[in-house]
């Protein structure tokens, strides 16, 4: 069945930039890798906003996009709370809190996937390998570094809180809810 699957390129409606939600790029790379897909960003001519896309086998890319959208939704809903709770502070400070939480959540998700991978290797001897069709299909993508100033000015407690919540991220909760609706 896997051999018959086509490589699919799916562009999401999720956008970010170096100034707005820059953590989304890292999150897409981490989630893509853990679902045997390649996360990438693209920009329309003359725009600063990056759009996120994934390349992978049909089944993998569908799950990957659903998990990614759920993860972004989790972070954005918490960012909404952070903005509400800190409305009395300067906008630069609030933005730093929000980005810190986003980067922390991303690092936490990465750690959770790393632990899961370790358990799979020990228990089952399973190792995730990127399908060669996906590697070939994503060859044309560049490897340009995405660096945001926000990464250099993180706020410790929000980063840590995001990290903790990221390690507890469970995509099956949301995906299971959607399936039963």
Segments from the language model and where they lie:
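Extended, helix-rich structural scaffolds rather than catalytic motifs
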Residues: 3-181
């Amino acid at each position: 069945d896997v051999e018959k699957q086509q490589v699919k390129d799916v562009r999401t409606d999720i956008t970010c930039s170096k100034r707005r939600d820059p953590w989304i790029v890292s999150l897409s790379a981490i989630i893509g890798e853990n679902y045997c897909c390649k996360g990438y960003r693209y920009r329309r001519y003359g725009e600063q906003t990056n759009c996120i896309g994934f390349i992978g086998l049909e089944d993998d890319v569908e799950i990957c996009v659903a998990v990614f959208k759920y993860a972004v939704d989790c972070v954005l809903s918490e960012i909404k709370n952070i903005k509400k709770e800190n409305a009395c502070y300067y906008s630069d400070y609030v933005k730093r809190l929000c980005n810190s939480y986003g980067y922390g959540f991303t690092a936490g998700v990465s750690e959770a996937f790393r632990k899961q991978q370790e358990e799979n290797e020990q228990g089952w001897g399973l190792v995730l390998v990127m399908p060669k069709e996906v590697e070939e299909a994503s060859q044309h993508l560049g490897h340009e570094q995405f660096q945001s100033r926000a990464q250099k000015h993180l706020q410790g407690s929000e980063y840590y809180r995001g990290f903790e919540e990221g390690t507890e991220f469970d995509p099956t909760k949301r995906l299971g809810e959607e399936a039963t609706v």
